[in-house]
Every structure is written in C-alpha cells, then in structure tokens.
Amino acid sequence: MEERKKKFVQGESSISEAGSSGLFAPNSMAIAFTGKPLTALANTRTIGVRDSLSKTALSVEDITIYAENGASSLGVGEHKILMAGVSAFTEKNGTRDKKPDLRVSFDFMNYAKACGVEVEAKTMSTPEEQAKEDERALTAIKHFQQKLRENCKNLMHTSINWTERINRKEAAYNGMVFISAYRITSKTITLEFSLSAADYMVQLPQTTRPIALYGIDDRKYNAYSIGCYLSAHYAMNQNVMAGTENLLRVENILKKTKLPTKEEMVQSKSHRTWIGRAKEPFEEALDELKRCGLLSDWYYSHSKGIPLSDEEASAIDSYEEWSQLLLCFEVANFRPRAERRALIEAKKEKTKAKKEETKASTKSRKRKTKSKASEA
C-alpha cells in the first residue's frame, strides 16, 4: 500500500487523466462540503508552538493542527488546493447514496488560470517574441506545478484534532489527515482523500463557494481570510432569510486576520497609528477582493445597510469606534436576494412534504402490520 501511494505521489501511476473540466469557470460558483476544520484553516491568525513530538502545533478556532517537517503554518496555497479538492469531491459524492470515491481529478490549466497564473502563451507578432512567450508559459507551468506539489506535501504531513457537532451529536476527531496522496501533471491535478476524511465530509452540509476566491494573491493572506469569511456568511440560508447576509461587524472580520486586535494595539511599541496598522490594511484587503472579482461593492454602514455619510466616516477617530462599525458588502455572481429566498422557501416546502409523506407511509405500514397480526 505504501509503495502504491509513493508512486502515486511521485506521478508514476497510470491513473486516469479524466477530471472536472468545468469546475473553475470564471464568474461561477462551486458547491463544497463545509465543516469546522475546512473553514478554520482559512483563518490566518495561528499560534505556532512546539510539542514533545517535535511537530509544529497550530491552534486556531478551537482546532489543533499538527504539521510535520517543521512547517510553522498552512498558507493560502494549501487551503486553495484543499478546497478545490473538496469541491471536486462534493461534485462526485454529494448525493450521499453510495460509498464515497476517495479520488478526485480536475483540470490543471483551468485551476491555474483560476488562481491568476498566466499558463497560456499569448500570440505574439514575431517568431522570436513567440518563442520567448512560449518559454515563459512553460516556465510558469513548471513553477506552478512545483508550488502545488509543495502545497499537497504540506497537507499530507498535516493532521488535525477537533470536536464538532455532527447530526446533532458531538464528535471528536483526532489525527485526521485530509489528503493521503496526490498527482500533479500538466493536464490534471489528482487528489486522494483519506477514508476518515471522506466519511467525515459526506456527513456535512454543503455551501456555495465563489471561484473568485482562487484569484486572490497567495501573499495577501488577510484578503483571502476575509474573502472566505464574507462569502461563507453571504451563502448561509439563515442570513439570507434574515436579510443580514451582506452585513458583518468589522470587529468580527478582524478576528479572521493577522491585523492587530485592540489588546495588541495597546501592548505594541510601534509608533504607527491604528489607521496605518489596522484600518488601511483592512481596506486594502477589501479592495483586493474587488480586484479579483469576489466583491462587487463594500462600504461602512449603519444597522440596516445604510451607508455612513462622509461626515460620519471622517468623524471616526479611534480603533474602538471603527471596529464597531458594520461592513456592508455584496459578493458578486450570487442570485438576487429575492430569488434566493424563493429557492430556500421552495426547498423547505419540498423537505416538509417529503417528511409528511414518509410519516404517512410509516403509519400505513404500521396499520397493515397490526391488521395482519389481528387476522393471525
């Protein structure tokens, strides 16, 4: 088994090249299972310490991550490829009516382009320029392949401990590894999930995940964490029905980033103001989300999404006051709120009708069983 896995990781296996070619279409959405570790790993506020096993222990959002080989954290690249695999896994196993298929494949070029990597050679005006452009594209492909292999290797050497309520029961997970094997070629990315990860994921609810998240620069980790948090909040049905899917308090968003908290601002010896250390980087991250096409708009607002006036915005002169503001935002490419509400209501009615049908069928079977018993 170990030998087979080794060959698979090194790209020597003869597995199929078939993949999910339409998974990363621009301006589209993907469906993905969503659970505690999958969302927590997008949070960049991690604390690195050493334990007795010489592994790196990272604590974030009540989960503990153990990374071998001295890795101090999991970056944006690791979370992107993991969630790409989860989306492909959801597409393949989302019906939950059969034993999950652990192996998923998707198109390398489509994924690279979704991540903003220019892997296709442009048409140039001269043979010399074309040769240089072809070489540039080939180099970009090789570098991205190398990066993906490093991302997948980090995930393979990462185990996670956490507790989570699944199907109304509290469950404890220890030492779970999500990715057990991988293969990267110039055509296909193939990931193999561990059996324990697959069994866990098929119990989870599904969410809508914008493809635009992959276009965020890997180095802009605050923007990525914020983007994941805003899009997850925007996709929740209960938020849509309450009319709050596009509103979040700045203070809560900051908790998902490495930007300084109020306590860190007080303790710091930096001479930079709260505006330069927190507000400006926060707004730069939001602008990055507009640049990559995730957000169509954002602004500070009052409780019902009413924008702050210029006078109100300029009057804010402290970190405390700024962090209590609401951020109003719109995630691009989602259906309008009214349409989303109608779909949610229709799904509720369908679920209700199915439950009533099941209940009636159960009663009917009991009556027939009772009748047969009486005749006997």
PLM feature segments, named:
Residues M1-A376:
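Charged, alpha-helix-forming regions
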